[in-house]
A protein has these predicted regions:
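Single conserved hydrophobic/aromatic residue that forms the stacking wall/gate
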Residues: 1-23
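Intrinsic-disorder-associated, low-complexity terminal segments enriched in Asp/Asn/His/Tyr and depleted
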Residues: 30-32
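Short, compositionally biased
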Residues: 41-43, 52-164, 168-169, 189-190, ...
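Functional-site microenvironments in short loops/helix caps that host divalent-cation chemistry
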Residues: 74, 81, 85-104, 142, ...
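Active-site beta-strand termini and strand-to-loop segments that position acidic
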Residues: 284, 355, 492-495
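Acidic, metal/ion-coordinating pockets
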Residues: 362-634
């Protein structure tokens, strides 16, 4: 496995093809879709949070960069957690040598879910001097530093530090050795816009600066540490062009730091000298800061939209990201937010560009890609998990990156969210904590309600739960206002492919069964499942059909013989996979005609049976479903 090509070994010819992130560690390129990323996940756990496999950041040959062509990297759509993975107080502790209060980091918080809904192209490197020169030669463009005559910033060897604004310094000369392969600097935000407009004409597509969300999504490539190269300052000092702080220098402004003119490591480098991240992008930390398209607002994360945030509609300063060659590691972190006035031109500030795909390209791209569906087991947000939510703690936080790293995530909700109704008489009743919906909507596309706890507060509680989920954009299935709605199922459009989810309950099903006049669950009857599979394939033209069952015996590690028989019958009827839960433990798995049968996922978020170690193990299952061929799963 480790001998296969990793992302940093992609040839320039590969850059124009899909450089997709693999599961969890996201380290392999698109050409190796069957690589077992779970191995890297285990490997990363063994290494601990402070390091990543050295393989990813080994020596490599810098990429070929030419002035007359951007070799785009295609970035897939997806969800990620934006912002600092730890709260401001912890950041202050992690970087205590900088003597910063927690409030200094407040604009990186709260960490929140962002969905990038469309794939896009991004330049693998920062725009180079040579690439910018071609733009100037073809258009006669003059930068703001040249037009206003004030110049930019640059290195003065006599003073041994950077000075500015100074007419001596523009994008053509920053005072240090600078070839056509170096990142262009001393360009204002307006200069970047002019370059994008010119390149849009040449590329025959919209070219622009990345949004702040797109930039962090690309930087992280699903790595939720301080840096995409590790979690310590040393990791970014070794994996990017940044400056090592000292007790003396850490208290000085960057522009006042003395620089040795004979030390080439004190300045920017040619692009791509360090290994890329898992998306195949170079210098996302250090080298030069990078302009983004967004205005800055310190409180923006508090009201930022979930999908494709564009930043505030107006502001006074523009956001820049990533840190520069003279930045200390604190400011090169993946989540660090910095800003400049739009007319700024700096010796450590450049840019990279994004190109939008047409609607036709997105449609064709989606047709060629597999879709990935995550399934998890029992979710109960009362008791311990409920207390956590009441205290503002996210019970899903430790697996957030895995939950988000899919096209859709589905679970089994074993509690009531609605406040209507009365508690029915039974041994265990679960009422999800207030605000549970705010955490569920971060991660879940759909939830099955076909279980014995959906009815804990009677029909009013059940329908209240259905309505709350609907209000939060979460689909539900397996229960409803009558038997028709309970059996109806849920149709998802997952990147242009139709996925039908069907839910059924077997445990004491007579007590919770929906009828023609009463809300409840869809009971697990083999003939109903077969009928419903055939119905959704015919009426909805569903390509993918997955029954999600609440069945089996509790605390048993193997299914009943009848379950094995029924699962095969449903696959014969057209089911793509069969997924189950309820026993509170994981069970044997089967495969039939290439379709996986997961009899029980066990608990996911649940503190029932706290003294029994068997229930401490739960599975998350990912189905990878290509346009044609068998389903892959892990």
């Amino acid at each position: 496995f480790f001998k296969q090509k990793t992302a940093y070994e992609i040839s320039t010819r590969d850059w124009s093809s899909d450089v997709c992130s693999s599961d969890l560690a996201r380290c392999l390129v698109h050409r190796y879709p069957k690589a077992h990323a779970s191995l890297l996940f285990v490997f990363s756990l063994c290494l601990g949070a402070n390091s990543l496999p050295e393989l990813l950041y080994a020596q490599h040959t810098p990429p070929e960069v030419v002035a007359d062509q951007i070799r785009w990297v295609r970035i897939p759509s997806g969800k990620f957690m934006m912002g600092s993975p730890v709260p401001p107080s912890q950041l202050a502790m992690d970087f205590k040598e900088y003597e910063r209060e927690g409030s200094y980091f407040q604009d990186e918080y709260p960490q929140h879910v962002v969905e990038i809904t469309k794939p896009f192209f991004i330049s693998p490197t920062e725009v180079t001097v040579g690439q910018f020169r071609l733009f100037v030669e073809e258009t006669g463009y003059r930068t703001e530093a040249e037009v206003d005559g004030f110049g930019g910033w640059g290195f003065d060897p006599k003073e041994k530090k950077c000075v500015g604004r100074d007419p001596r310094f523009t994008w053509r000369d920053a005072g240090y050795l600078q070839t056509d392969l170096f990142p262009v600097v001393n360009v204002s935000w307006a200069d970047c816009q002019a370059y994008c407009k010119w390149l849009s004409t040449k590329e025959k597509r919209i070219v622009r600066l990345p949004t702040e969300a797109e930039w962090e999504y690309c930087n992280r490539a699903n790595i939720y540490l301080h840096y995409n190269v590790g979690n310590t300052s040393q990791s970014v000092l070794e994996g990017a062009r940044t400056r090592k702080p000292t007790k003396e220098s850490i208290r000085q402004a960057v522009q006042n730091l003395e620089i040795d003119p004979d030390d080439s490591t004190s300045f920017p480098q040619r692009v791509g000298l360090y290994a890329p991240n898992a998306f195949g992008l170079y210098d996302m930390h250090g080298n030069v800061w990078e302009w983004t398209n967004d205005w800055y607002d310190a409180d923006y994360y508090k009201y930022s939209p979930l999908k494709d945030p564009q930043g505030p509609v107006q502001g006074y300063v523009k956001i820049r990201r990533g840190g520069g060659w003279n930045s200390f590691p604190l400011w090169a972190r993946s989540s660090f937010r910095n800003w400049n006035t739009a007319e700024s031109r700096c010796v450590n500030l450049g840019f990279r560009v994004v190109a939008e795909l047409s609607s036709w390209e997105i449609e064709e791209y989606n047709k060629q890609q597999p879709i990935r569906l995550n399934f998890v087991g029992d979710i109960m947000l009362d008791n311990g998990p409920g207390n956590a939510i009441m205290n503002g703690i996210d019970p899903f936080a430790n697996v957030a990156s895995w939950l988000l790293d899919s096209d859709a995530t589905i679970g089994n909700l074993e509690c009531v969210l609605g406040r209507e109704g009365e508690m029915i008489l039974k041994p265990y009743n679960y009422l999800g904590a207030k605000n549970s919906d705010q955490f569920l909507k971060r991660y879940f596309t759909a939830l099955s309600l076909a279980n014995n706890h959906a009815y804990d507060f009677g029909p009013e509680g059940l329908m209240g739960t259905v309505n709350i989920l609907k209000q939060n954009g979460i689909g539900s299935f397996g229960a409803g206002e009558d038997i028709n709605s309970a059996r109806h199922g849920l149709l998802l459009n997952v990147r242009g492919r139709k996925v039908a989810l069907l839910g059924y309950n077997h445990f004491r099903m007579e007590d919770y069964e929906a009828t023609e006049t009463k809300p409840g669950c869809a009971s697990l009857k083999t003939e109903w499942v077969i009928e419903d599979i055939k119905r959704v394939k015919k009426d909805w033209n569903a390509e993918i059909v997955i029954p999600f069952l609440h069945w089996g015996r509790e605390m048993q590690d193997a299914p009943l013989d009848i379950q094995r028989i029924e699962a095969k019958q449903w696959i014969d009827a057209g089911a793509t996979a069969v997924i189950g839960g309820h026993p509170h433990v994981v069970q044997t798995v089967d495969s039939y005609r290439g379709a996986p049968i997961i009899y029980s996922l066990g608990n996911f978020v649940f503190d029932y049976y706290p003294v029994d170690p068997l229930v401490w193990i739960g599975w998350g299952v990912r189905l990878t479903i290509p346009p044609s061929g068998p389903v892959e799963w892990e």
